[in-house]
Amino acid sequence: MAPSRNGMILKPHFHKDWQRRVDTWFNQPARKIRRRKARQAKARRIAPRPASGPIRPIVRCPTVRYHTKVRAGRGFSLEELRVAGIHKKVARTIGISVDPRRRNKSTESLQANVQRLKEYRSKLILFPRKPSAPKKGDSSAEELKLATQLTGPVMRIRNVYKKEKARVITEEEKNFKAFASLRMARANARLFGIRAKRAKEAAEQDVEKKK
């Protein structure tokens, strides 16, 4: 079996001229400097906008292994923007990332991101396109003087863990079967449509029998 991914190479019996095929990594320090210079150049180019780019939504990581954690997503959904009262075309011009493919599967995620958008909108300093003729929604001259470029991520997302105090385990919790409950919940979700169809057919047959 061939070695897979980044694991240890077991019993390496080298026959070919392997010294010539060793992968080197001498460009790593220079690459680090190049990335840093590119970040600084971009920050200067987009100033006074935030250096890290537009604001991102709070999303939950996929799969059972990671879904207890939240992280930054790609862009806000169209529904979130609609509830927050921001037009999708205007959003991109004021530093809000938009992802039209994303769907909100829960009310909690929708509310959290709408709140995030409203908070961002309240903190935002909008420069007028024409300084001589500011429009409605643009920031005042005093606010513009206070504006500085944000270097870190816009409204950093943090995982908050709530600590629970120690208590006595109840009898109900002792008798609870977690694995069986999960299997049953999955089975009920999977068979929901089939059972509904069978119930409907049974009801129709009963009506026909009564006739």
UniProtKB/Swiss-Prot annotation:
For biological process, the GO terms are: translation
* Phosphoserine modifications at: 52, 77, 106
Covalent link Glycyl lysine isopeptide (Lys-Gly) (interchain with G-Cter in SUMO1), residues: 174
- Where in this protein does the record say N6-acetyllysine is found? 16, 177
For this UniProt record, the keywords arranged alphabetically read as follows: Acetylation, Cytoplasm, Isopeptide bond, Phosphoprotein, Ribonucleoprotein, Ribosomal protein, Ubl conjugation
Q: Name one GO cellular component term.
A: cytosol
On subunit structure and binding partners, the annotation says: Component of the 60S large ribosomal subunit (LSU).
Q: What is this protein called?
A: Large ribosomal subunit protein eL13
Task: Report the gene name.
Answer: RPL13
